[in-house]
Amino acid sequence: MGDRNLTPKQFGALGEQYAAAWLEEHGWTTLSRNWHTRYGELDIVMLNPEYTVVFVEVKSRRSMHYGYPQEAITPAKQHNLRKAACDWLLDRRNRVPHSAVRFDVVTIVLRVGRPLVHHIENAF
């Protein structure tokens, strides 16, 4: 999984794909992937088993040399993700019965062998 020949965009997409599959294995349902707004992109929108709509920001790295992946989610990025999430919730095509909304972060270190996954619930 840690193929050095991937472009940064391909590497990020691989991390998002792995995160979605990992969450689906835990009973979550994918509602949207790579949803674009004027505020940026929502990586993954999922419905968890408790009927919470979860906006999942995925950060992938090849190593921990540059710090924790979640450190890349600045307050400004969080602000834009909240605005994008509001747009997603207001879009009629995204109507889904839910009991709550939250923001999670999934970090993935794609290394040789098995990727290291860390799921941070209610990250911000």
Curated annotation (Swiss-Prot):
Which SUPFAM superfamilies does the record cross-reference, listed alphabetically?
Restriction endonuclease-like
Extract one GO molecular function annotation from the record.
nucleic acid binding
One short Pfam name that applies is: UPF0102
Q: Which domain of life is it from?
A: Bacteria
Query: What InterPro entries does this protein's entry cite?
Result: Restrct_endonuc-II-like, tRNA_endonuc-like_dom_sf, UPF0102_YraN-like
- Can you tell me which family this protein belongs to? Belongs to the UPF0102 family.
Q: What is this protein called?
A: UPF0102 protein BL0935
Q: Which organism is it from?
A: Bifidobacterium longum (strain NCC 2705)
Its taxonomic placement starts with: Bacteria, Bacillati, Actinomycetota, Actinomycetes, Bifidobacteriales
